């Protein structure tokens, strides 16, 4: 069932795509986006619009200005040079960067800067969650299996629509209020992760091996954005089966709708 916010026309949600080495039309670099993101935004009452594959700062700033909120999505690994000076070769071999020479990394760093400068609602998912941490000087685990002793298997690509492990939520956090839960089952399709949030953020969900499954702005900084929720798991792949994950998109779209009214 389509969820319709109470606030007039649907808010415009800027969605950051992945990049593929060979697209279906001319087999060159192409923007790529799972339809699950668009479906989840539409079902929550938003209107998704894919961000252009450019690093032009002025163009990206204008995209953020026209949007009522931004969704940062999953995809290939972030360039480790952005958060770590050196890694052993055996770890670097596991890193699969975007095929565009780092342009997606550059583009999303600009988008994040503009989101905070223009104070737009933000929902960050998987890679987007990691990029948000990197943008503020945080570090990542480049390969969980090699760097986190006793870690769970977080790379369950065979079960993207299933709840494969649990995350403990911080009582009173935005995520716990949205999902009305203290423990949340999540899917898990990643091999990199945040283990320590950057300075503006606080972890609000962790798996039992310490991996940060969600982070939000620190309470004293919560006013910096109208809405910020950053999650490692993929709620867009869970919305059809579980109402609490639909609520994540509904709350995000509601925040975007309020932002739309405020700027009109």
Place the predicted regions along the sequence by residue.
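N-terminal beta1-alpha1 cap of cysteine-dependent amidohydrolase-like domains
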Residues: 1-121, 134-136, 141, 145-178, ...
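Short secondary-structure junctions
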Residues: 183-184, 203
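Short catalytic/ligand-gating loop segments at beta-alpha or beta-beta junctions
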Residues: 185-191, 215
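Active-site-proximal beta-strand elements of phosphoester/diester hydrolases
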Residues: 229-233
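A generic hydrophobic-helix recognition signal that picks specific residues
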Residues: 130, 183, 225-227
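Active-site loop->helix "elbow" adjoining a glycine-rich segment at hydrolase catalytic centers
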Residues: 127-129, 136
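Active-site glycine-centered loops adjacent to acidic/histidine catalytic or metal-binding residues
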Residues: 126, 190, 234
